[in-house]
Amino acid sequence: MKTCPSEVTPLTVERLLEAGAAYLCRHGMEEEEAQSQARILLSEVLHCSLSALTLHAQRVLEEALVQRLREQFKRIASGEPIQYVLGTWPFHNIQLRTDARALIPRPETEELVERILRSEVWKRAEQIADIGTGTGAIILALAHAARGTNKRFTAVDLSEAALSLAQENAQALGLSDVVTFIHGNGAGGLPACSCDILVSNPPYIATAEVNQLPAHILDHEPRMAWDGGADGLDILRQIILDGTQVLKPSGRLFFEIGDEQGLSMQRLLERAGYADVVVARDFAGHHRYAEGSLL
């Protein structure tokens, strides 16, 4: 049986990239994905950009680093997400600690942050709340963008483990003084008419479909971060209802949604009395975002 790439010595960066990708392929990963994972892993460990890896191609790696990479390649080959293996991951303009306490932030959610930052309500918003904060990705990216302003932020999560991770990220980013963390279920515990913006990337996959998710998700990421009830809309419905109580007049609700939930979300928002309802697509052309303003 062939060994993990780091057991071959001496190893240059170039050789490890080749051997690492081949190792991942032997463990069932597609070639393109294996090459990408190997490059990301090496660039993070060497603290350089992906484009700069070629500049380090002939660098001989120290034994301690080789052993560290060996273990990391093994973890990735076993199906553990690279975000958890590395322990940190970039999101928007911040770096987040990532582990099994919370869902891994996705690129689609960065666009949700951008939609908020481009909105008219953002310009005047003073109080912003994130429901189901997870790693804190959304609320901390917004708080980072608002440095030097009078904006204040609240992050809510039902999972104490996820909330502790979000608090660690806030502390690491120097944002603890502008973000309040609340252990709770939904937005119902927030004061009435207190928020200018309510945002959430909630669980939106139907319970019956959760078990069909890829193994690297089911085996490592928290199930509660995916399971949205029988039709995937349970938590979305509750936040829409809560929003009618906690949003200020003209406050706006922003959601990330499932790719087949656009029409349902439009109807739910309009029936709850929201105006200027928008359902938008992500960069892959799928319905991914819904928003509406409270009259």
PLM segments and residue spans:
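Conserved Class I SAM-dependent methyltransferase catalytic core
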Residues: 230-293
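Conserved SAM/SAH cofactor-binding pocket of Class I
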Residues: 107-212, 238, 260
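Mobile active-site "lid"/loop adjacent to the S-adenosyl-L-methionine
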Residues: 204-235
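Non-catalytic accessory regions of SAM-dependent methyltransferases
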Residues: 1-46, 53, 61
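Class I S-adenosylmethionine-dependent transferase superfamily signal
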Residues: 142, 217, 239-243
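Helix-to-beta-strand junctions that scaffold the AdoMet/dcAdoMet cofactor pocket
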Residues: 175, 221, 247-249
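Conserved beta-strand segments of alpha/beta enzyme cores
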Residues: 95, 152, 178-180, 275-278
